[in-house]
Swiss-Prot record:
A Pfam family per the record: DAGK_cat
Binding-site residues, ATP: 39, 65-71, 96
Main location: cytoplasm
Protein name: Probable lipid kinase YegS-like
Organism name: Xanthomonas campestris pv. campestris (strain 8004)
GO CC entries: cytoplasm; plasma membrane
Length: 309
């Protein structure tokens, strides 16, 4: 039997990771043909995935943070082939927050993550397809809006590198006096909500922005989109809630959040609204977010909380 052929796509910011280098060496000694490609500029992941498909690679591994995972997943989803034909997807978490990996219980150490890919068969997973003013996008984890999105967008890259997820909380605290509600109309099958909100989570996965568990019950294989809307409140209550949301405190969300589970959701706003798509901001006045069932296959732990079975 021919050896497994993998293509690891590494975020260029993590090229100095010695643990990853050693882990790649271990997998190669086990007989896996493991090639490494490093992203340098926009479009590299798309090109590397296309090359992997043309080369008959069996598994594409995203090595980086949530943005790298989403970029590689999107590059796979852009191809017309179905999930059974496309290479499977693996993840080595090397980002600041690693929200998807944390929620999915994927090992945070490179050797453990690569070992999981070798040991566990790939399973179907959903992806979010987002249509906006500037064309379609794909999202593997969570699309978020409002207070949490501004925190993620504004968090300094140097601060993230030094402090990890704590950087998001510090940035959130600095915004306490300027939580601006956003007005929007949300519609989906048998669902309609209109008003001002301060936080929004659209979950394929469960958490984003350094531990904000906006969609704590989301599943990655149920064909449904988990929606969490945190309505606007007034004065000090809003500021306090904003801090709790940033810190991932579920009690605050449970008391005030509007929650539903839908195959798709449309969002309309008079003012431009920014959604954070796994770290990439997209601004539009209209969004359609659809959960595309079983779009890819991914290697996940047997006890992964995001799986329905």
């Amino acid at each position: 039997m021919a050896p497994s052929h993998w293509r690891l796509i590494l975020n260029g910011k993590s090229t100095d990771n010695e643990d990853l280098r050693e882990a790649v060496g271990v997998l190669r000694k086990r007989g896996i043909q493991l090639d490494v490609r490093v992203t340098w500029e926009e479009g590299d992941a798309e090109r590397y995935v296309a090359e992997a498909i043309a080369d008959g690679v069996q598994t594409v591994v995203a090595a980086g943070g949530d943005g790298t995972l989403s970029e590689v997943a999107a590059a796979l989803a852009h191809h017309q082939d179905d999930a059974a034909t496309l290479p499977s997807l693996g993840l080595v978490p090397l980002g600041t927050a690693n929200d998807f990996a944390t929620a999915a219980m994927i090992p945070l150490e490179p050797l453990g993550a690569l070992g999981l890919i070798a040991e566990r068969a790939a399973e179907p997973i959903d992806l979010l397809r987002i249509d906006a003013d500037h064309g379609p996008h794909w999202c593997a984890n969570v699309a978020s809006g409002g207070f949490g999105t501004q925190v993620t967008v504004e968090t300094d890259a140097g601060l993230k590198k030094m402090l990890g997820g704590l950087a998001y909380l510090i940035t959130g605290m600095s915004r306490l006096g300027r939580i601006d509600p956003i007005s929007a109309h949300f519609t989906g099958p048998d669902f309609s909500w209109e008003g001002e909100f301060i936080a929004l989570g659209l979950g394929n996965g469960r958490q984003a922005g350094g531990g904000q568990a906006l969609c704590p019950e989301a599943l990655i294989d149920d064909g449904l989109l988990d929606v969490t809307i945190v309505p606007a409140l007034n004065g000090e209550v809003a500021a306090t809630l904003g801090t709790l949301v940033t810190g991932g405190k579920q009690a605050a969300l449970e008391r005030v959040a509007v929650r539903t589970r839908l195959p798709w959701l449309e969002i309309a706003s008079v003012q431009p609204l920014t959604l954070n798509l796994d770290g990439e901001p997209e601004t539009s006045r209209h969004f359609r977010v659809e959960c595309v069932a079983a779009r890819l296959r991914m290697h996940l732990p047997i006890d992964c909380p995001l799986r329905s079975a």
